[in-house]
Amino acid sequence: MEATISAEIFRDLTAVADEAGLLRFGAVRLDDPRLDHSRAAFEAFIAAGHQGEMQFLAHTKTMREDTNLLLPGAQSALVGVMAYAGESSAVARYAQWADYHTIVHRRLELVAKRVRDLLPGGETKICVDTKPIPERAFAMLAGIGFQGKNGCLIVPGLGSYVVIGTILTTGALAFDPASESRPRTSPPTARPWDACGSCRAWLDD
């Protein structure tokens, strides 16, 4: 019998995420056809050689396209974000912080444990910038934010100084994620950065 995540269960998970310190939380089906745009964009990026010396991007392309290679039977992605602080300097703000991989992973584990408690037989896989998944696309489709002109995920109310954490799960969403994910932003388009309007802060600052 397939494990399913109902709207009621998702609200329970959202409460756990809130208590764990995740400032935004949403969900997306892994078979959402809108993910095709992200996959096509990544294919074009690799084909053009834009990865430069980051050859691992090309080497993990197949895994990025098929999350079943990371978690067999994966049906959904639960996405959470945390904001980080720091001073403006030559060192990136996220690098001034404690290791976000560990911090976000620990908080996601609280949610993942709840998933496993509520879905007998359900499995989870936590990804915090260490697994080849389209986490930014997941976050956008989950209604958490949009892709800015700077290429980063921009979360209304938090900006782009956020880190994304994802829980892949074999639990299938039995509700419309758009009705439950909060706060909700507009669905991504082929030009998601249009939401930036005429803003050039990423270039001018």
List PLM regions with ranges.
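Auxiliary alpha/beta "docking" domains used to position bulky ligands
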Residues: 1-194
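Iron-sulfur cluster-binding cysteine motifs and their immediate structural context
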Residues: 32, 195-205
